[in-house]
Amino acid sequence: MSSLKNWDNKTWLSSLKYIQKFNNFLLNQKKLNQNSIILDIGCGRGKIIGSLYKKIKFKKKPIGIDIESHKDIDKNMIFKKQNAVSFLNQTKKNFDLILIKQTIHLLEINEIIRLLNICKKKLTISGKIFIFSLDPYKNEIPTFKLMKRKINNSLKRDKKIFKLIKKLDFSLIEKKFSYKVNISKIKYTDMIKKKYISTLLNFTDKQIFTGIKEINTRYNKKLIFNDKLICLILSK
């Protein structure tokens, strides 16, 4: 599979309003202070943990790891272009919060189990793992037909992943996060062109072009919908 480069590249996911709401959600679920140590697995450009650093004023910058590097990475984090398992096996740090946002579905089942078991060993006593993924039951993402079919197949797999995680040896709480998106159709089709979501990564240029034509026909000039996520909060 191609790497996911544009999920936080000038999208609502990288907007100040989204990041503020997301970080407020995190802080309502997990108390953090200046001494907290943070890790973001699949951090993208690191805007979320970079904003969290400025808000809390951590003594140590959060660490973000991703297999894709960008020129516009947030300066308020330490970025490592590395596989998550490799990093966790090498580091001597323990973390108060490990964030895995809309990344877990990209892994094979055995990789998920291995990753979470290592993450557990790297938690502080009160540390927590936050796993975010699209809500498979109430998804409102605007789509064209082929995209919809691919997303539905992906969400079916997500349900299986959730069931698997719930069987692992963790204390687990399930929460929901929702953000109301208000975006122009022109901006959204540009995001589709840039393949902002993993579902689109293997689509051909022709499939993307046809899909955009379908979006232009089906939807109004302004798209308003809820971006809904399931959040699994794991602790020892």
Regions picked out by a protein language model, each given a short descriptive name:
Residues 113-125:
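A short glycine-rich, Lys/Arg-flanked "PGG" loop and its adjoining helix->strand segment in the class I
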